[in-house]
């Protein structure tokens, strides 16, 4: 790791740093990652045209930063994913082998006990990388009685460590392998302020802050879906999906003339759900994005 910092007269600022980091969680050849970052800042309040005319402005700093951050936290249960694991057959409570391999048919059929893979090796797994950009302003006025900070941030996270879902059944895998198959972008702004005032012998400070952030799943290894709205791609992380309620069933005639609700027997007074795809039935293929996520944007 290394860092270079330069400050000229508290007016211009330059900072560069980097890290070259290794992790035991990845296979040789993928263990190391290089993560650089830099930042630039300009304190406009130190310029003569401001100092001579706006004496009540103590600081007005404009700054920008760009950098990459690596993440090797794949969970204790997923350590060393580049190693495969196998298990012997073992026996159940009846004394019979758990895993039996059958060969041949009819009178020529044979059964053999053996071992099986419990985890496939994922040799290509490497660092999850977040590319971050931040544009901000730091403000201080009236001898630091009022201070404020505002930031706009943007992050694109690639190589997110997830379980593979788009795998054909003919692979015969008992457990799905892991891979760097996720990609998410997020952006928003963050602001805070502080107002300080002395009233006699009492020092008072009023503080406030606000944060707004939104994200979107750009890539995720998912099974094929009949309808595009069933994918998580294109929606927010942890987006809640469900059926759309259209009202209540008035009577049995209403039930008979409405799309069939496949999740159970309905009666008058039960909720009537919308047939989103128009196929005449209401089931999991009619679940769409509804409501907010588990983490609010604001």
Regions found by a protein language model. Give the residues of each.
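Surface-exposed, low-complexity loop segments enriched in small/polar and acidic residues
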Residues: 1, 166-179, 227, 231-233, ...
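Surface-exposed extracellular loop regions of Gram-negative outer-membrane beta-barrel proteins
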Residues: 1-26, 31-48, 130-132, 141-148, ...
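Flexible, solvent-exposed coil segments and beta strand-coil junctions
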Residues: 13-22, 44, 109-118, 164-176, ...
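Feature marks short, surface-exposed loop/turn motifs that line or immediately flank catalytic pockets
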Residues: 22, 70-72, 156, 212-216
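Short glycine-rich beta-strand segments
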Residues: 43, 65-69, 209-215
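Solvent-exposed loop/turn elements at secondary-structure boundaries
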Residues: 50-129, 145-147, 151-184
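Conserved small-residue
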Residues: 77-96, 198-294
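Glycine-centered tight-turn and secondary-structure capping sites
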Residues: 134-136
């Amino acid at each position: 790791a290394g860092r270079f910092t330069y400050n000229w007269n508290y007016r211009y600022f330059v900072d560069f740093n980097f890290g070259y980091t290794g992790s035991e969680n990845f296979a040789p050849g993928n263990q190391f990652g290089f993560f650089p970052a830099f930042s630039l800042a300009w304190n406009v309040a130190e310029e003569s045209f401001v100092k001579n005319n706006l004496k009540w402005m103590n600081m007005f700093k404009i700054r920008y930063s760009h950098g990459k951050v690596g993440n090797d936290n794949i969970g204790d249960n997923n350590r060393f994913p580049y190693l495969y694991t196998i298990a012997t057959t073992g026996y159940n409570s009846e004394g019979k082998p758990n895993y039996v391999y059958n060969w041949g048919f009819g009178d020529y059929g044979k059964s053999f006990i053996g071992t099986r893979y419990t985890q496939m090796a994922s040799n290509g797994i490497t660092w999850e990388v977040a590319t971050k950009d931040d544009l901000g302003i730091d403000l201080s006025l009236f001898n630091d009685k009022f201070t404020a900070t505002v930031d706009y941030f943007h992050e694109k996270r690639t190589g997110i460590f997830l379980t593979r879902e788009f795998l054909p059944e003919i692979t015969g895998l008992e457990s799905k392998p892991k891979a760097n198959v996720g990609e998410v972008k997020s952006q928003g702004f963050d602001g805070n302020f502080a107002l300080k005032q002395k009233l006699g012998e009492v020092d008072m400070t009023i503080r406030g802050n606000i944060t707004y952030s939104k994200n979107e799943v750009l890539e995720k290894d998912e099974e094929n879906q009949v309808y595009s709205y069933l994918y998580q791609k294109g929606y927010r992380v942890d987006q809640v999906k469900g059926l759309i309620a259209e009202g209540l069933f008035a009577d049995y005639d209403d039930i008979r003339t409405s799309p069939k609700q496949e999740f159970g027997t309905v009666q008058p007074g039960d909720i009537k759900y919308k047939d989103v795809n128009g196929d005449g039935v209401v089931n999991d293929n009619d679940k769409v994005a509804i409501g907010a996520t588990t983490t609010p944007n604001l």
